[in-house]
Design a protein with these regions (language model features):
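Residue-level recognition of single "structural anchor" positions
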Residues: 1-225
Length: 225
């Protein structure tokens, strides 16, 4: 059985397209299996392959931010609360640093911690040339000015969320998007989180496009293995 979208698989092309449409609409794999009449194990496998392709696309499309206004924020993914743990990123949460260029694309990177060293490493890797950086008041952002950036803060701890054009609403919208879609998964294993994390980035950056058409064209040109 030949499938021009998928190598070495006994899946009808119409079934693949049906599962792909569900995946593009971000439906859970079990829901897709029921809607498409495809075995749930097969559907989970297809979702995994499509997720890996999304990650490859996200990495291929990533470009440094050159100049302009860049919003930076850190967030934490994982259990809502761990008994006895307090503070930023307490417990078993996974720290992620996010950057978003105004009127442009976003970029998020998993890090060991959100220390000043890690933050500056990610910033210097992603932001090139003179840029104006907007952050919250977290002390780890100290020193951006000394590294040649213009730096504006909004102090959330003082109930300040915007001062004119000074805000980080864009990257916070990305966090909301990512956490909402991950919540639909009803739990993601830590070893699978990097895939889901980059998938969220790609979906966010291409959210105004027809994801089904993009992925159909991609898998037609470069079939999944």
């Amino acid at each position: 059985m030949r499938n021009k979208y998928l190598r070495r698989a006994r899946v009808l092309e119409r079934d693949f397209r049906a599962v792909l449409r569900c995946f593009a609409h971000d439906l859970p794999a079990l829901t897709a299996a029921k809607m498409c009449g495809v075995n749930k194990n097969t559907t989970h496998r297809l979702y995994g392959l499509l997720r890996q392709r999304m990650v490859a696309l996200a990495e291929a499309e990533a470009r440094p931010f050159v100049g302009g206004i860049v919003e930076i924020d850190e967030s934490y993914f994982g259990p809502r609360r761990v008994r006895g743990k307090r503070g930023r990123g307490a417990g078993r949460k996974i720290p992620v640093i996010g950057l978003l260029k105004r009127a442009g694309k976003g970029f998020a990177q998993i890090v060991p911690n959100c220390s000043k060293t890690e933050l500056l490493r990610v910033v210097h890797g992603q932001v090139k040339g003179p840029a104006t950086i907007h952050t919250d008041g977290w002390k780890a952002y100290d020193g951006l000015v000394w590294d040649g950036f213009k730096h504006h803060r909004v102090h959330h701890h003082e109930n300040e969320f915007a001062r004119g054009k000074r805000h980080i609403n864009g990257i916070e919208s990305f966090w909301s998007f990512a956490k909402t879609r991950l919540a639909k998964q009803r739990g993601v294993r830590a070893d699978k989180f990097p895939l889901h994390h980059k998938e969220s980035e790609w979906r966010w950056n291409d959210r105004r496009d027809n994801l089904y058409s993009l992925l159909l064209k991609e898998t037609r040109s470069y079939p999944l293995n």
